Amino acid sequence: MRIAKILLPVAKLFPLDYLIPEDLELNIGDLVVVPFRNKELTGIVWELVSNSEAKKIKTIRVKVPLNLNITSEVLELIKWMSSYYMSELGSIAKLVLPMDIAEKPIKVKEQKVNNNFVLPDLSEEQKQAVTILNESNKPTLVKGVTGSGKTEIYFHLIADYLAKGKQVLVMLPEIALSTQIINRFIERFGFEPIIWNSSVTKAHKKMILRGILSDKVKVVIGARSSLFLPFKNLGLIVIDEEHDDSYKQDDGILYNARDTAIVRGTFDKAQIVLCSATPSIETIHNIEIGKYQLVTLVNRYKNVDLPNIEIIDMTKEKLSKNSYLSKLLIEAIKGNLDNKKQVLLFLNRRGYAPLMLCKACGYRLTCKFCSSWMVVHKATKKLECHHCGYQSKIFSSCPECLEDETLTICGPGIERIEEEAKALFPESKIAVISKDHAKSPEKIAQLLHQMENLEIDILIGTQIITKGYHFPNLTLVGVIDADLGSNNADLRASERTFQLLHQVGGRAGRGDSKGVVYLQSYYPDNTIFSYVKAGDEDSFFANELEIRKSADMPPFSKTASVILSGSSEAKILEIARDMVRIAPKANVKILGPASSLMSKLAGKYRYRILIIANKKFNLQKYLKFWLSLIKIPSFCHLKIDIDPKSFY
């Protein structure tokens, strides 16, 4: 009897046994169509065996035509992810095969490489970087100041790999970043790269998967899920803005796409290049211990000057009511506009105001399903929870004490900054970019096009605007609240604040005119600002690493979070306490249980247990044993987060 264990792209499923028809020859990695419940699915031949313990075995229908199969390297990646992130194989297979590709033949357009393309001249510093990269045999970080030409360096590497007939993957934390890179890519290489993200249609994704499996697709630019594409001939993986938290998936399988891509590069024997002006602490540590190599660019392309950074002490400002721009920043904006230069105002807070409260009883309007405040959105006349999406009308009276005309709004969001900017500069063309105002890559591309063509004078944006955009006529950046996020009770709060301020400041002065960045702060003596102002990231990283080491926290240790959630807070807390009580205490440090920073999310109360262990300790083996000691009731949802990035 010939049996094939078939891995189906179905969540929480392990390989299932199927009979192999007599006339069918199969190899591990082949794609086959099998009956599953009341439908047919495409699955991966995971293992070939001679017997089965299953009482009833169905038969494989057919092998997928066109010699489409999954390489042994991708199969190894699936196994590694299942083991490391403690997830079922079927859930990971769903990332590799997100939809059925065994339907009728799809015409796949082959990417034709134009061999006559001419890459621009590199500076001497960039040439040295390319030489080092060509000789490197380990993951390499290209660390350069904002505007130093990191993209041009990996474009030269792409050219080399295309000449060898290899496939290339360029990963971006947000596909919104892709617009400018795609345009530059087409200029350089004469063909359009494939884009892979959540907005690509199902039909187009099928075509892309067929193209990758048949080696007709050579270059893909994609978000985190692109690392699972079934490349057959992968030669280069570029991870741009490698420090970005968007590489960590916080729902479904909790994985870090940057780290997983590096593992994939090992399996595929592909070169790994990481790029960032503000690399993650983990990457800096990996360089220090010799695991990664470093290439540094200290000059901006064409030796353009870095912007000056000024700290504005907001405790000395006498702001009028509903005003959030300091006099110094307003005067700087006026001067910039008079000189026909563009302005970026940055506030990492969506909506009009983050809080509405009652002046009579002090009640704060919170989400009925979460422990978060409801955000005021004036444009839509709604209150919205930015965590679960719940919306309600804007109340005219307090829902708690029922008093009329006692509700007031507190603090600014970008809609409020837009309102103030329009009042101050009525003749200027002002635009806003955030998840609310640019909900699609097409809308983002439109705004970027307007900015590049000087159709916008003042751009007001959230974190989305900090990621690698190049506007040569932008010479002034104003950070409305530089304190936001720096005082969070979070291991990475200082790191994130430094990276964010450095990145947003790097948008200024990338053309012929020198830029200036104003940071508005009520805590101007914050040491982070001194590092940002001096551009001294090396000292910042050294200090941050010393703090982490003394606290025995990553990257000097391993961590995992066990997250318990359910509709009864008392029952969830009881289970969490029982888990900690029975947990083996040798070789690990256990913190908690503690309420998550977001203690209630989508109607579920949430508690966390944090496990800290030595770098060489097998944390996954420990967690499996620990979880085997207790039965978790069905009303309690348990998630394991290996290498957690946040504790919300």
Curated annotation (Swiss-Prot):
Nucleotide-binding as a keyword? yes
Gene Ontology terms describing biological process: DNA recombination; DNA replication initiation; DNA replication, synthesis of primer; double-strand break repair
* Binding residues for ATP: G144, V145, T146, G147, S148, G149, K150, T151
Residue sites binding Zn(2+) 1 per the record: C358, C361, C398, C401
Keyword field: ATP-binding, DNA replication, DNA-binding, Helicase, Hydrolase, Isomerase, Metal-binding, Nucleotide-binding, Primosome, Zinc
| One Gene Ontology MF term | ATP binding
Q: Which reaction does it catalyse?
A: Couples ATP hydrolysis with the unwinding of duplex DNA by translocating in the 3'-5' direction; ATP + H2O = ADP + phosphate + H(+)
The function of this protein is: Initiates the restart of stalled replication forks, which reloads the replicative helicase on sites other than the origin of replication. Recognizes and binds to abandoned replication forks and remodels them to uncover a helicase loading site. Promotes assembly of the primosome at these replication forks.
- What family is this protein classified in? Belongs to the helicase family. PriA subfamily.
What this protein is called in its record is Replication restart protein PriA
Which organism is this entry from?
Rickettsia conorii (strain ATCC VR-613 / Malish 7)
